Amino acid sequence: MNADGPVVNVHVLFFAKSRELANTPRSKVDVPTKITASDLLDLLVSRFGLISIRDNLILAHNESYIDNLSDTVLFKEGDELAIIPPLSGG
């Protein structure tokens, strides 16, 4: 994992299939204050058993989508992270 600095506790919200796989609508997780989006995704997939939908997940940090997995994400204590799989239906 490419992470620097201290660790903070963030709130994680799960939607749709990610909620089903994680078996909870919300959780808390410790993350580095500075981490690449790719490493963050790997951490969340591993921690919450989301491997089956890994390639289709969208992450949002404090209600802003993380568009590029090479981006660095900066966290503060109590930040919010949403895990959003693509919605399906008709």
From Swiss-Prot:
The modification Glycyl adenylate is found at residue 90. One of its GO terms (cellular component) is cytosol. It comes from the Eukaryota. The modification 1-thioglycine is found at residue 90. Gene3D superfamilies: 3.10.20.30. GO terms for molecular function: molybdopterin synthase activity; nucleotide binding. Pathway: Cofactor biosynthesis; molybdopterin biosynthesis. C-terminal thiocarboxylation occurs in 2 steps, it is first acyl-adenylated (-COAMP) via the hesA/moeB/thiF part of MOCS3, then thiocarboxylated (-COSH) via the rhodanese domain of MOCS3. Pfam families: ThiS. GO terms for biological process: Mo-molybdopterin cofactor biosynthetic process. Its main location: cytoplasm. It is found in: Cytoplasm. Keywords: Cytoplasm, Molybdenum cofactor biosynthesis, Nucleotide-binding, Phosphoprotein. InterPro entries: Beta-grasp_dom_sf (IPR012675), MOCS2A (IPR044672), MOCS2A_euk (IPR028887), Mopterin_synth/thiamin_S_b (IPR016155), ThiS/MoaD-like (IPR003749). Belongs to the MoaD family. MOCS2A subfamily. This protein is produced by a bicistronic gene which also produces the large subunit (Mocs2B). Acts as a sulfur carrier required for molybdopterin biosynthesis. Component of the molybdopterin synthase complex that catalyzes the conversion of precursor Z into molybdopterin by mediating the incorporation of 2 sulfur atoms into precursor Z to generate a dithiolene group. In the complex, serves as sulfur donor by being thiocarboxylated (-COSH) at its C-terminus by MOCS3. After interaction with Mocs2B, the sulfur is then transferred to precursor Z to form molybdopterin. Heterotetramer; composed of 2 small (Mocs2A) and 2 large (Mocs2B) subunits. This is Molybdopterin synthase sulfur carrier subunit. The gene is Mocs2A.
